Structures are given as C-alpha cells and as structure tokens.
Regions:
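Outer membrane beta-barrel
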Residues: 162-187, 200-370, 434-470, 477-479, ...
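C-terminal helical cap
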Residues: 30-35, 83-97, 483-487
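Positively charged n-region of N-terminal signal peptides that target proteins for export
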Residues: 1-4
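Outer-membrane beta-barrel pore domains
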Residues: 144-152, 187, 199-200, 357, ...
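N-terminal periplasmic/intermembrane-space "pro-region" immediately following the signal or transit peptide
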Residues: 47-50, 69, 109, 125-182, ...
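Bacterial N-terminal signal peptides
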Residues: 6-16
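Histidine-rich, glycine-flanked metal-binding segment
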Residues: 21-25, 38-78
Length: 544
C-alpha cells in the first residue's frame, strides 16, 4: 500500500515543478523517518550514489566529496528503499498516519520527491558536512519489549512484500532463522590440565553450534499493540549427531509483551530473566562468540515467568522485576520446582546531547527458594569443550545471586564490566559464597556505533553501514575480554578459572558475519594448575 501511494503521489509531479538545484545522482539525505511497523518508525540517513540507492542507515553518513547533503528535518518518507536501484520516494513534512491531510494536500506537504532517479521536487535545506554538525535528529523509538528478539530485526520490518514477512488486519510478523557453524582447535594444553579435564584434542573439530528459527510480530487488537515472540532451536547437532536425538527441538522463547503505558509493559511466558546486561543481550550481538564463564555458571538462560518493566527519569532509568518457576520444562509441579524472584535497575548518570557518549550503571538481584538445590559449572567459554569448573550438585534451603554492571560507550568504543556473587544456604556444606567478574572491551574499526536500548538498558547489535554487497568492506570489530570465576569455598572445591580472550569480528552484512576467538585459560582445581590455549572460528548466517 505504501508503494502504491508513493507511486500515485510521484506521478502527480511533472518535470516543470520548481526544484532547488540538486544533483539527485549523488546526494545524502539526513534526518528522515521511515515506517518500521504500524506502531513505530525509525530515523535514518540515506546515501544515493550514481543515481542508485547505496545506503539507508540509522548511523551517521559523512558527506563524500562532490555530494550534496540535505536535511529532511524529521520528514516522513513514503516509497521503496531498495538498495542498488534508482530511488523512487517522496518525503512529507508530517506523519500521514497521524494527519491524513498530509496525503491529501501533497502540493503543500511534499518537501522532496524523486521518481526513478529523476528529481521532481525539492524544498529541503542544505545540511552541514557531517551528521554531528547537523540539527538534532529525532530519536527512534526502541523495541517495545524488555527483552529484544534473539536476532536483530531488519530495518525494513513491516514490508509485507518480503516473503518472510506478513501483515493482516490485526497482525504483523516476520519469520527469522539463524545457523551458526563452529570450528574448534586446541593449540596447547599442559599435563595438569589433562589431569583435570582430559585430553582436549578429543574436543577438536567442527560442529553446527546452533540452528534457531522463530517469529516475532505485533497483535493490533488493542490500543497499544501486543508483541509476540516464538523461537526454538534444534539440539541434534550439538549432541554429536546421535540418531535417536536428531529431531530434538526446544522452544526456548515464547512470550507475550503487553504494554500498559508508553513506558511500562508486562511480559509473560518463557523468557530471559531480567538480570545482567550480558545475559539480557542476544548472544549473536555480543563482541565475543560466547558469554563469559561467570554469566553461564551463575545465571539461567531462560525461565518461565512474568516480568513487569518500565522506564523513569525521562528514560535515563530502566527497571524490571519478575517471578519465575520453570515447572513446564522441569516435569515437576510448581510446588516442587524452584521459584525465583529477580529484579534489575539501570541508570545513565551521563548521556551526551547526541547520545554518542554515555555511561551505564546497573544492579540486579535473584532470590530462589532452592527447591531443586544449586549447581554451578561452566565450560571455558568454548561450546565444544568439557566443564573446567564444577561445584557438583548442592543441597540448598535457598540461594541468591547479585549482579553489578557498568558500561561506557563512546562512538565505536565500548568498555563493559560485570560482577556476580552467589550465596548458597546448604544444610550439609554450610553457607557458601562464590563469585566472578569480567571486563570486556570492543572497538569497531570502521566507525559504527552500537545503539543503546533505553527500554532494556542494553546495547544493540553492531550496525553495518556499507556491506560487501554494496561494494564496501562491511564492519570490522576488535574485542578483548578478561574473566575470572571462583567456585571454591569451604568444603567445595569447584575450582578457579581465569580466561584472557581476544576476538575479531567481520560483519560482511547485517545477516552474515565471520569471527575468530582466541583464549588463554588457567584453571586451579583438584590440586593441579592447568593451562590451555584454544581457538574457535565461527560463521553466522541469518535469514533476511
């Protein structure tokens, strides 16, 4: 429908329309809104080179030599943004969804029009040479739910012409899928490490790390649209191609997000617990291939429950709290399954005017009645490896975890740190305390910047300004991380492990990336001091 409207509107402009002198073949248009779904829109910047649409991005686009930069000043774009083709779209000075008169009187409200590369109208003002010098751009609305989808949403979400997207009178949706291919190699391992975990050469080789698929969309039966999320994963590949488990499939994320107000919503279903930025963020959006040993050991991946979340202080603060009981997957009754109460609060003590520089602080806590005991263990941040530290199952009258987090992001630079402490009230082993922390740094060499999600208090995926399919180099990111975990206390010798990790990520496009991780691992356990070095290569492909 949007394409049809744009075609009809553009057809109404003839070559005699007066236009400001602009070369439509080489132009940058900044500060323009496009529809992302019926309930939201995003602000983007557009680059047209040699009469073809080369780039549409939420990130800054510098003005190349010989180009003209125009400021759309928050205008609303209707048309078809198809990369590699001559542009055909119109920019209106208002949102036609809020005021239909904008469409009825395009002679007044159209500020820019181009049809198959031919300029039909332009009354936009020239913009400054860089986005930083331009007027303040409108801020895009964030994802409605507290926990974003497991995969990045495309910017063209809501385009029912795409085969994997749909739209009816009361629903919208998009089908997403991802496959992750890994190759593991262990260059070295000392004899103490072999005594602790065995010969790591048996864990070398390739594997399909995961195959995930699902759908996310909106339900428009209510004043504020509800968001549904359904995702599953096959486990057959990670289980060594066992014939009797080839069809194993786990629904790991199914929930409804119901907004009460513009700043508060309720999520019900199987979902991530609201604690730790690293845990809430999608795995495919982190700078390293796997989460830290600290997060994997102490915090569950997902649980069944309800989360109430919202923002305060003009979105400088986010909060979330929930109750969880995983009786559906445990096979036990609610009374015989552990019940947990979880909460998280984040705060931005500093945000620059253009939001390119910010400081994030967060605190989270988790309390469980310990009905199913406690058990903390983890691999050395490689999926294809044995557990290096392990407390073994512990009886428990209750257990708790608390989390401290801090992040500083300035443009392409990101520095993050988290601490997690875990306490167990064990009738046989006494009061036990375990802990761990990590410090992670990321530098996007090509200059892109991760968006900050004010609703959830997390950072988003790495944007790709110019993919290899557009003649660019894609996006390159360097990452480094140090993590430490201590699972030894009292009579429990779960071990202590420190890991230094280095990584390089190459995002060829928003849906295709390859990366390489190196880790140096030291492990003190069972009276031995083991060390090992591991390397993992990964290919990630997502369905567009």
């Amino acid at each position: 429908m949007r394409r049809l409207i744009a075609t009809l509107l553009l057809a109404g402009y003839v070559s005699t329309v007066t236009a400001q002198v602009v070369d439509p073949q080489n132009v940058v248009i900044r500060n323009v809104y496009v529809a992302a779904a019926d309930a939201e829109h995003v602000a983007i910047n557009i680059l047209i080179r040699d009469n073809k649409l080369e780039l549409a991005s939420k990130d800054a686009i510098p003005t190349p030599d010989g180009f003209v930069a125009l400021d759309a000043n928050g205008g609303y774009l209707i048309g078809n943004l198809k990369l590699g083709e001559a542009p055909s779209f119109i920019i209106l000075d208002g949102d036609p969804r809020e005021d239909f008169d904008v469409l009825l009187d395009t002679e007044t409200h159209a500020v820019f029009a181009v049809h198959q590369g031919a300029l039909r109208k332009n009354s936009l003002l020239y913009a400054s040479g860089t986005l930083d010098e331009a007027e303040e751009e409108p801020k895009p609305r964030g994802w409605l739910a507290y926990t974003p989808p497991p995969m990045a949403m495309p910017t063209n979400y809501g385009d029912e012409a795409k085969w994997n997207q749909w739209k009816t009178k009361n629903t919208t949706g998009i089908f997403l899928a991802a496959v992750v291919l890994d190759r593991q190699h262990w260059p070295s391992q000392n004899s103490d490490s072999e005594q602790q975990v065995g010969d790591l050469e048996f864990f070398e080789g390739g594997e399909i790390r995961g195959f995930r698929l699902g759908a996310v969309g909106t339900l428009h039966y209510f004043k504020r649209p509800w968001v549904y999320t359904v995702f599953g994963a096959t486990n057959a590949f990670d289980k060594g191609f066992e014939v009797d488990r080839q069809d194993d499939f786990t629904w790991f994320d199914y929930r409804l997000d119901m907004p009460f107000t513009d700043s508060m919503s309720l999520s019900v279903g199987k979902q991530k617990e609201p604690i730790s930025m690293e845990r809430v963020m999608s795995l495919v959006q982190l700078p390293m291939q796997e989460r830290t040993s600290v997060s994997d050991a102490f915090l569950p991946s997902r649980n069944f429950g309800a989360v109430l979340s919202g923002t305060a202080l003009n979105q400088r603060m986010s909060w979330a709290g929930g109750l969880f009981n995983n009786f559906i997957d445990s096979g036990h009754s609610i009374g015989n399954t552990a019940t947990a109460a979880i909460g998280r609060v984040t705060w931005l003590p500093f945000v620059s005017e253009d939001e390119s520089n910010l400081l994030h602080l967060g605190f989270g806590a988790r309390f469980s009645n310990g009905k199913q005991g406690a058990h903390y263990f983890t691999e050395p941040e490689f999926n294809k490896s044995p557990n290096f530290v392990n407390t073994d199952p512990l009886d428990s009258n209750g257990n708790s975890q608390f989390n401290l987090e801090a992040s500083w992001r300035r443009g392409p630079y990101w520095l993050a740190a988290e601490f997690i402490g875990a306490d167990v009230d064990s009738p046989t082993s006494g009061d036990l305390s375990f802990s761990g922390y990590h410090v992670t740094g990321s530098w996007i060499l090509t200059g892109e910047m991760r968006d900050y999600n004010f609703k959830s208090g997390i950072l988003g995926p790495v944007p790709v300004s110019r993919s290899v399919y557009q003649g660019g180099w894609g996006t390159w990111e360097l990452a480094a991380r140090y993590s430490s975990i201590d699972l030894t206390d009292g009579l429990i010798d779960g071990g202590e492990m420190d890991i230094l990790s280095l990584g390089v990520n190459w995002y060829l496009s928003p849906i295709f990336n390859v990366n390489l991780n190196y880790r140096f691992i030291t492990n003190d356990k069972d009276g031995f001091s083991g060390d090992a070095q591991g390397v993992m290569s990964r290919v990630l492909l997502m369905l567009e």
